[in-house]
From Swiss-Prot:
<keyword id="KW-0949">S-adenosyl-L-methionine</keyword>
<feature type="binding site">
    <location>
        <position position="252"/>
    </location>
    <ligand>
        <name>[4Fe-4S] cluster 2</name>
    </ligand>
</feature>
<feature type="binding site">
    <location>
        <position position="266"/>
    </location>
    <ligand>
        <name>[4Fe-4S] cluster 2</name>
    </ligand>
</feature>
<keyword id="KW-0411">Iron-sulfur</keyword>
<keyword id="KW-0547">Nucleotide-binding</keyword>
<feature type="binding site">
    <location>
        <position position="27"/>
    </location>
    <ligand>
        <name>S-adenosyl-L-methionine</name>
    </ligand>
</feature>
<dbReference type="GO" id="GO:0061798">
    <property type="term" value="F:GTP 3',8'-cyclase activity"/>
</dbReference>
<dbReference type="Pfam" id="PF06463">
    <property type="entry name" value="Mob_synth_C"/>
</dbReference>
<comment type="subunit">
    <text>Monomer and homodimer.</text>
</comment>
<feature type="binding site">
    <location>
        <position position="28"/>
    </location>
    <ligand>
        <name>[4Fe-4S] cluster 1</name>
    </ligand>
</feature>
<dbReference type="GO" id="GO:0061799">
    <property type="term" value="F:cyclic pyranopterin monophosphate synthase activity"/>
</dbReference>
<feature type="binding site">
    <location>
        <begin position="254"/>
        <end position="256"/>
    </location>
    <ligand>
        <name>GTP</name>
    </ligand>
</feature>
<keyword id="KW-0456">Lyase</keyword>
<dbReference type="InterPro" id="IPR006638">
    <property type="entry name" value="Elp3/MiaA/NifB-like_rSAM"/>
</dbReference>
<feature type="binding site">
    <location>
        <position position="155"/>
    </location>
    <ligand>
        <name>GTP</name>
    </ligand>
</feature>
<dbReference type="InterPro" id="IPR007197">
    <property type="entry name" value="rSAM"/>
</dbReference>
<keyword id="KW-0479">Metal-binding</keyword>
Amino acid sequence: MLIDKYGRVVDYLRISVTQRCNFRCRYCMPTTPFSWTPKENLLTFEELFLFVKVAIDEGVKKIRITGGEPLVRKDLDVFIKMISDYKPDIDLALTTNGFMLPHFAKRLKDAGLKRINMSLDTLNEQKAKFIAQKSVLHEVLAGFEAALDAGLKVKINTVALKGFNDDELVNLLEFAKFRNSQIRFIEYMENSHAKEDLKGLKSDEILKIISQKYNVTKDEKLPNAPASIYRLDDGYKFGIIDPHKHDFCESCNRIRLSAEGLLIPCLYFEDALSIKKAVANGDIVAASEILRQVLANKPKENKWALGAENETSSRAFYQTGG
């Protein structure tokens, strides 16, 4: 079992398999010219899988595949099957923008994937084009339906932005509700690599908008979950992720592995260690020791929760993994 110095059980591993993405979302990607980490510098699926086995054997019970956009990496379903075959009852999930799901949803399900979190910030084609910087909405919505048809559980992630989709929050909630999917509204997380003068809505502003149509009641927060849960009178539940609040970190159970092999204890801290050499050499003992070292580096709270309201991440989110 993995337990950090604050007594939190860490049983959730988020793995970024690529930095690359087929979107250029304004709140994620840099506005200035940048280059991807060369493919030859990324961990192979075999190297990633070696660390996955170490993590599972140490007590990890949940794995989420992220990017970039994970589906742009070739043979992702093969990697998912490797994990599923090793630990069939592992909680195995994927975060995606949904664009490529019409082609991959069934293959992912057959490989052992159980759940998908899908980004959907708007139901308006022009707004979607503005955020992603390409026409995407038709394919994204088709991907949502393809995932449901394949038998995957789908949760929607919506970044709530002032003057952009604040007039759509109720429509997005109803879109998810009528399709028996949960939606989570995410406060915009500032990072120094994506500056578009975007302003996020705070959790109380999101609740105020939804409460104009629905009676909203605070529900019990799920253990280790980052989202605060709210319930409508008909029983439908939705979430709000607010990383600025103190309790966002108090039960954090996750660590992150970047595509190039950096094991990261927290999205907003830079105390990462590389497992690249260990897994390239097939050194399970060294990989396990690095895992323990990173666990020891895991902070009690992120910088926002510590009071740094204007803090931004110095590492771009597409590099760390969503």
